[in-house]
Curated annotation (Swiss-Prot):
Stated family: Belongs to the AccD/PCCB family.
Protein name: Acetyl-coenzyme A carboxylase carboxyl transferase subunit beta
Catalytic reactions of this protein: N(6)-carboxybiotinyl-L-lysyl-[protein] + acetyl-CoA = N(6)-biotinyl-L-lysyl-[protein] + malonyl-CoA
GO terms, biological process: fatty acid biosynthetic process; malonyl-CoA biosynthetic process
Disulfide bonds: none
Gene: accD
Principal location: cytoplasm
Quaternary context: Acetyl-CoA carboxylase is a heterohexamer composed of biotin carboxyl carrier protein (AccB), biotin carboxylase (AccC) and two subunits each of ACCase subunit alpha (AccA) and ACCase subunit beta (AccD).
Function: Component of the acetyl coenzyme A carboxylase (ACC) complex. Biotin carboxylase (BC) catalyzes the carboxylation of biotin on its carrier protein (BCCP) and then the CO(2) group is transferred by the transcarboxylase to acetyl-CoA to form malonyl-CoA.
């Protein structure tokens, strides 16, 4: 045949791997702009690329390490876990999905509460984990935020929520949607007590989170370039049949329109939060 020269004459050719070197996973990170960053350098810079300023998506472990002095904090309500109240099943049973994501992430749900000091200022921080079913809002998130607010009221402490979520958890249906009202009611109590509430919006913050407590904080901060909105840009574009403005739904766009108070780099968030607490609490 004309293309016989493409064929191997000898089958099952093997290549020796004796001299090959394994590269540990996570040793290097590539940003969307193509910049290659060594993992240790990235970690030392709070997971922000020093080359282009890109903020790599991180979870509660990293955020607590960045914010709390010497990474010392006490986790609150760690034993609260999701249950399959509806026997829900989509492509797989919800109970099986929970087991898989818990094993993969070593988390119990999509949010963690902790109390500690940020540059000496004691406060409570709730941080969402996007790696746990997209940081979705379920009954556990609502309950943990309720308990965090009660702790703040009992101990007269400021409160911060780090938001990164795709919205409500569909597997919990109405139970999930009920959490919006539940959380807002508790945050109203926090406000009535004269206690500070700070929200830090990270990429992405969407759905019911944006439609409720992400946008009702006393001070709203956001990471540079974070996507923030209710529905995604593709859904909006297909619904209205028009192209969207450039930079639509970015934190910078929202600050320009008055929805975000400050754009704060992750490398500066600890200092910004502690200064805000000093200014507004003392």
């Amino acid at each position: 045949m004309a293309f016989d020269w493409f064929k191997r004459k000898t089958k099952n050719i093997t290549t020796s791997t004796e001299d090959k070197k394994d590269v540990p996973k996570g040793l290097w990170h590539q940003t969307p702009t193509g910049k290659i960053i060594e993992h240790e350098e990235l970690k030392a810079n709070n997971y922000v690329s020093p080359e282009d300023g890109f903020h790599v998506r991180i979870g509660s472990r990293e955020f607590f390490s960045i914010l709390f002095d010497d990474n010392k904090f006490t986790e609150l309500d760690a034993n609260v876990e999701s249950v399959d109240m509806l026997g829900f099943k989509d492509t797989k049973a919800y109970v099986d999905r929970l087991k898989e994501v818990k094993a993969k992430t070593k988390l119990t749900d999509s949010i963690r509460n902790a109390v500690g000091r940020v540059n000496g200022e004691q406060m409570v921080i709730s941080c969402m984990d996007f790696a746990f079913i997209g940081g979705s809002l379920g009954s556990v998130m609502g309950e943990k935020i309720r308990r965090a607010v009660d702790y703040c009221i009992a101990n007269r402490l400021p409160y911060m929520i780090i938001c990164q979520s795709g919205g409500a958890r569909m597997q919990e249906a109405t139970y999930s949607l009920m959490q919006l009202a539940k959380v807002q009611a508790k945050l109203a109590q926090l406000s009535e007590e004269g206690l500070l509430y700070i929200a830090y919006l990270c990429d992405p913050t969407f759905g019911g989170i944006t439609a409720s407590f992400a946008m009702t904080a006393d001070i709203i901060m956001a990471e540079p370039g974070a996507l923030i909105g209710f529905a995604g840009p593709r859904v909006i574009r297909e619904t209205i049949g028009k192209d969207l403005p450039e930079g639509f739904q970015t934190s910078e766009f929202l600050q320009e329109k008055g929805f975000v108070d400050f754009i704060v780099k992750r490398t500066e968030i600890k200092e910004k939060v502690s200064k805000t607490v000093k200014l507004l609490v003392h």
